[in-house]
Design a protein with these regions (language model features):
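Active-site signature of cysteine proteases
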Residues: 175-179
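A short beta-strand micro-motif
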Residues: 4-8, 161, 187-191
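Short, low-complexity, charged amphipathic interaction modules
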Residues: 182-206
Length: 206
């Protein structure tokens, strides 16, 4: 049985120039994990932020005032900011898209550097921006091993899966989730010509 994922998928008739709000009930939705030819998984270094992001994603999906439309993709973000990032309090119809929803969730979770990206760009990130800019914020690890991209077994709640044109959030831990939280990953870097071992704990605290 696959884990559940949250996503913004498609408007009532397509991707652009849609009616505000979730007209079909499936524009934002919870679905089963699938192999979407993922290029990377963005994992929150803080489990607390991961949980806040997942809760925001779930709340956005439940709020039928939030729909899908690439043309007005930032209106949900601005509405969320106006209510202190509690998306359940959005009472007027607004829009988002797949990557704009993930950005909203990250900012609601307390990722100040992601919020700074939005301010600098004047726009939510695309999937390209997510893969290239989010790891540099310090809030995320970018995981590209096949065990994260081709199966849900090693995913954690709050993980953000990114492909060339779509992004979703894991809303449950995979079957190996406990091991993922506890494992200490050994990596190596070269400093002044010398190899130095670095140990990074996956379930880093705030």
């Amino acid at each position: 049985m696959s884990i559940k994922i949250g996503q913004a998928s498609l408007g009532e008739t397509g991707g652009r120039n849609q009616q505000p709000g979730n007209q079909t009930g499936r524009e934002l939705n919870i679905s089963n994990w699938y192999n979407g030819r993922w290029l990377g998984v963005l994992r929150y270094k803080s489990r607390k932020k991961a949980e806040r992001a997942a809760q925001t994603c779930e709340a956005a999906i439940k709020n039928r005032n939030i729909g899908y439309d690439m043309s007005d993709r930032n209106t949900a973000y601005e509405a969320a900011r106006a209510v202190g990032w509690d998306v359940s309090k959005i009472t007027k119809p607004v829009e988002t898209d797949c990557s704009a929803l993930m950005m909203l969730c990250a900012v609601a979770a307390g990722c100040a550097s992601v919020e700074a990206l939005y301010r600098r760009q004047g726009n939510s990130c695309t999937t390209y921006c997510m893969l290239h800019d989010w790891p540099a914020t310090g809030d995320f690890d970018l995981l590209t091993g096949s065990k994260y991209l081709t199966t849900d077994a090693n995913l954690l709640r709050g993980d953000v899966l990114v492909s060339e044109g779509h992004t979703v959030m894991a809303l449950e831990d995979g079957k190996n989730g406990e091991g993922e939280k506890e494992v200490v990953e050994k990596s190596k870097i070269i400093v002044d010509g010398k190899e130095i071992k670095i140990y990074a704990e996956k379930n880093a605290a705030d």
